[in-house]
UniProtKB/Swiss-Prot annotation:
Places the protein is found: Nucleus, Nucleolus
Record protein name field: ATP-dependent RNA helicase FAL1
Gene: FAL1
UniProt short sequence motif Q motif, positions renumbered to this chain: 25-53
Domain notes: The Q motif is unique to and characteristic of the DEAD box family of RNA helicases and controls ATP binding and hydrolysis.
Chemical reaction(s) catalysed: ATP + H2O = ADP + phosphate + H(+)
Role summary: ATP-dependent RNA helicase involved in 40S ribosomal subunit biogenesis. Required for the processing and cleavage of 35S pre-rRNA at sites A0, A1, and A2, leading to mature 18S rRNA.
InterPro entries: DEAD/DEAH_box_helicase_dom, Helicase_ATP-bd, Helicase_C-like, P-loop_NTPase, RNA-helicase_DEAD-box_CS, RNA_helicase_DEAD_Q_motif
Organism of this sequence: Phaeosphaeria nodorum (strain SN15 / ATCC MYA-4574 / FGSC 10173)
Length: 374
């Protein structure tokens, strides 16, 4: 499984697609450039995943495309292969592609220097990209494609206007590709404002809860008892790496301090931290220098760390779409994974709503949960 995709689960996936969508069984069948194929195989890919086999050809044809499938199914590589974005630089090693990450919280001068030099691919956060366009350091007249990764998040109220700002600067013929693990109906409706007759490749919702990932809840009578429950779990389980999700930055800081006071080793990350600090924390976690990371939903999307075997929702997500993104951090690359949800009486309705939305059942945590992580 060099490409990090659980092939057994992938093969069972059912899609709802536009009529013109066909399945390309191999990368060769997609008629990709020879140099790109070399990069794909050198990166460890052997054959396309279910979403890749349906979406790559459509994007390469220049069609506006909406691709939705659960975490860990190769969506990032779907558009990376199509436009040579950076899973990135690796796929373009044989093509001399210039890529730059243009993100908030980093040095503006570096962005200006790199963009003035010229880039084939720019990946970035909406605010910084819009800023670079307004400064005229990112020139848009030759842009051929706009990709919205994690589109449900980018098209929510927080980012929507920034995305529209970017889109208004682009040439009318710009191809638009929308990618996400979850695409609520209102987000799909929104795409009609800036996409032209898009091809749709959507996994059926009851497929979305990640086969092979065990989901449990622990009933906790009072909010203030969650901390003791977490400490008991921490003492009981032998984990490789774990992520604990809280709903607010303040809660992340509070829980981190409490855990450290109790002599537990943890790291933490949230959106108030400078980008450089987040990068450093992330690197430590990837290299397994830290085993437990406490975070807000800033960590819930698009981040692969192979050894994460446990996700704990200290707080259930306030947005049910975020549930699938959170638990998808565990059990990646076909490994065993467990998600444990702390549920107070006030949370029962939210838990039932999540079960209904994803057509899944979340059982009470068994006594032998440690065996499931072994």
């Amino acid at each position: 499984m060099a490409d990090g995709i659980d092939r057994n689960a992938d093969e069972k996936m059912e899609f709802s697609t536009s009529k013109e969508v066909t399945v390309a069984p191999t990368f060769e069948a997609m008629h990709l450039k020879e140099n790109l194929l070399r990069g794909i195989y050198a990166y460890g890919y052997e054959s396309p995943s279910a979403v890749q086999s349906r979406a790559i050809v459509q994007v390469c044809k220049g069609r506006d495309t909406i691709a939705q499938a659960q975490s860990g199914t190769g969506k990032t590589a779907t558009f990376s292969i199509s436009i040579l974005q950076s899973v990135i630089m690796g796929l373009g090693d044989y093509m001399n592609v210039q890529c730059h990450a243009c993100i908030g919280g980093t040095n503006v001068g570096e962005d200006i220097r790199k963009l003035d030099y010229g880039q084939h691919v720019v990946s970035g956060t909406p605010g910084r990209v819009a800023d670079m366009i307004r400064r005229r350091n990112l020139r848009t007249r030759n842009i051929k494609m706009l990709v919205l990764d994690e589109a449900d998040e980018l098209l929510n109220r927080g980012f929507r206007e920034q995305i529209y700002d970017v889109y208004r600067y682009l040439p009318p013929a710009t191809q638009v590709v929308v990618v996400s693990a979850t695409l609520p109906y209102d987000v799909l409706e929104m795409t009609t404002k800036f996409m032209t007759d898009p091809v749709r490749i959507l996994v059926k919702r009851d497929e979305l809860t990640l086969e092979g990932l065990k989901q449990y809840f622990i009933a906790i009578e009072k909010e203030e008892w969650k901390f003791d429950t977490l400490c008991d779990l921490y003492d009981t389980l032998t984990i490789t790496q774990a992520v604990i999700f809280c709903n607010t930055r303040r809660k992340v800081d509070w829980l981190t301090d409490k855990m450290r006071e109790a002599n537990f080793t943890v790291s933490s990350m949230h959106g108030d931290m400078p980008q450089r600090e987040r990068d450093s924390i992330m690197q430590d976690f990837r290299q397994a220098n830290s085993r437990v990371l406490i975070s807000t939903d800033v960590w819930a999307r698009g981040i692969d760390v192979q050894q994460v075997s446990l996700v704990i929702n200290y707080d259930l997500p306030s947005n049910r779409e975020n549930y699938i993104h959170r638990i998808g951090r565990s059990g990646r690359f076909g490994r065993k994974g467990v998600a444990i949800n702390f549920v107070t009486q006030e949370d029962v309705r939210i838990l039932r709503d999540i079960e209904l939305y994803y057509s899944t059942q979340i059982d009470e945590m068994p006594m032998n949960v440690a065996d499931l992580l072994a």
